[in-house]
Each structure stands twice: as C-alpha cells, then as structure tokens.
Amino acid sequence: SLSASEKAAVLSIVGKIGSQGSALGSEALTRLFLSFPQTKTYFPHFDLTPGSADLNTHGGKIINALAGAANHLDDLAGNLSSLSDLHAYNLRVDPGNFPLLAHIIQVVLATHFPGDFTAEVQAAWDKFLALVSAVLTSKYR
C-alpha cells in the first residue's frame, strides 16, 4: 500500500491533470504503440493515428480511471473491480502489457509536469501504477 506522503504525491499530479486527461492518455497510447508495436493487436478497430478520436476517447478513459483509482487509494480492488473483470475475461489483455503502459504514463507525466514530477513523485506513481496493474491482473488464471 501507499504511505500518506506517496498518496499525496499521486494526488498532486492527478490534480494537475484536470481536463487534459484525453490528450495525455492519447499521447500515452501513441507512445505505447510506437515503443511496443505488439500492443496494437488489442485495438484492431481503432484509428491509431496520433490524436485520433479513438485514441483521445480511450486515452481519456485510461487517465480518468487512474484518477478515480487515485481518489480511492484505500480500496483500489473495489474501485477497479469492473475494469479487472473486463481486462481478464473479455479483453484478455496480456498482463505483461500493464507495466509497459505504466512506464509510458510516467514518461508522459514527466514530460508535461517536469517541475512537479520529481523523483519522489515518480517513485510514488511507479508504486501506484504497480498496485493498479496488480488489481487489473488479479482475476487472471
């Protein structure tokens, strides 16, 4: 679990994201697909052009889900239960992809919030995203 200072660090960045969720999420997906092209296979019906409506919509869902999770740090499993079901049973996303996206999200946050995304904040986000990944993959068999 996260310490009080780690929770505050995660929430400090969530507070800065504000209405930029779709743009940040779209950028994260674009970087993911460029860096790890094998991840494109989960999105055969998407327009993967950078800045596309599909990437903006799905990217926004990802960032908003993370913001929601950040506001429920004491019950991540409960907050993310439906997403865990979706990824494990319907989408069947390879669990190895979650750390890839977690890394990319940190790159995007560091790029957009360089003065705020300090080493301590990055460490808290790394831990937070690892906890989210663990919840999302908890229902895999």
Swiss-Prot record:
It comes from Aquarana catesbeiana. The modification N-acetylserine is found at S1. GO terms for biological process: hydrogen peroxide catabolic process. It comes from the Eukaryota. Belongs to the globin family. Red blood cells. Residues 1-141 form the Globin domain. Keywords: Acetylation, Heme, Iron, Metal-binding, Oxygen transport, Transport. The lineage of its organism: Eukaryota, Metazoa, Chordata, Craniata, Vertebrata. GO terms for molecular function: haptoglobin binding; heme binding; iron ion binding; organic acid binding; oxygen binding; oxygen carrier activity; peroxidase activity. This is Hemoglobin subunit alpha-3. O2 binds at H58. InterPro entries: Globin, Globin-like_sf, Globin/Proto, Hemoglobin_a-typ, Hemoglobin_oxygen_transport, Hemoglobin_pi. This is a tadpole (larval) alpha chain. One of its GO terms (cellular component) is haptoglobin-hemoglobin complex. Heterotetramer of two alpha chains and two beta chains. Heme b binds at H87.
